[in-house]
Swiss-Prot record:
Annotated protein name in UniProt: Guanylate kinase
UniProt similarity note: Belongs to the guanylate kinase family.
Enzyme class: transferase
SUPFAM superfamilies: P-loop containing nucleoside triphosphate hydrolases (SSF52540)
NCBIfam families tied to this protein: guanyl_kin, PRK14738.1
Designated gene of the protein: gmk
Coiled coil: none
Domain of life: Bacteria
GO terms for MF: ATP binding; guanylate kinase activity
Subcellular location: Cytoplasm
Length: 206
């Protein structure tokens, strides 16, 4: 029996991957987390798609030309990238490395396809699936966004059930009903707190 010990917990920074179907509220949840000034580093995804009027360069996405995106691929400077609905999206490696080296937890928002790609490369990341309470609510959210063409809306609604089938590949699920963003934020912060109490920390290597 141990009667005397000296235990100093050494916390390792986490790489958190937040994903889920289009319209589930990923942007809204992370925006609320940013409002609270939580000690996290948020990685901005790079994309070739056109910027929406409501979006800000360097905040919502880094918007670049297709030729620039191809250059990042050739330099192996993207953690993952994919062609989604005809546009390229990618997660830059450099800011992740920099944040982890400072000891900061890192949050990356990607679609379900991107999360699967990252899991093959960094299996020790923490994978969180943001879930709608039901398909009816997800449909209403997508329709109310007013940013989707009818064809894009049909594609996203057809893809959502297939994405939800990937739920078992994730570590945690957070249900995000309309109007309950604060609860979703609390659950994500509880996940982060629990992960920092692991006996065997997750070691992230990029």
């Amino acid at each position: 029996m141990m009667t005397n010990w000296n235990f100093n917990k050494t916390e390792k920074p986490l790489l958190l991957i937040v994903s889920g179907p289009s319209g589930v509220g990923k942007d809204a949840v992370l925006a609320r987390m940013k409002e609270r000034k939580l000690p996290l580093t948020y990685i901005v995804t790079t994309t070739t798609r056109p910027k929406r009027e409501t979006e800000t360069e360097g905040v919502d996405y880094n918007f670049i030309r297709p030729a620039e995106f191809q250059e990042l691929i050739s330099q192996n400077e993207l953690l993952e990238w994919a062609n989604v609905y005809g546009n390229f999206y990618g997660v830059p490696k450099a800011p992740i490395r920099q944040a982890l080296s400072r000891g900061s937890d890192v949050i990356v928002k990607v679609d379900v396809q991107g999360a699967a790609s990252i899991k093959k490369i960094v299996p020790n990341a923490v994978f969180i699936f943001l879930m709608p309470p039901d398909m009816d609510e997800l449909t209403r959210r997508l329709e109310h966004r007013l940013t989707e063409s009818p064809e894009s809306l049909r594609r996203r609604l057809a893809t959502a059930p297939l994405e939800i089938e990937k739920l078992p590949d994730f570590d945690y699920v957070v249900v995000n009903p309309e109007g309950e963003i604060d609860n979703a934020v609390r659950e994500i912060m509880s996940i982060i707190a629990a992960e920092h109490c692991r006996i065997q920390p997750r070691l992230i290597e990029l």
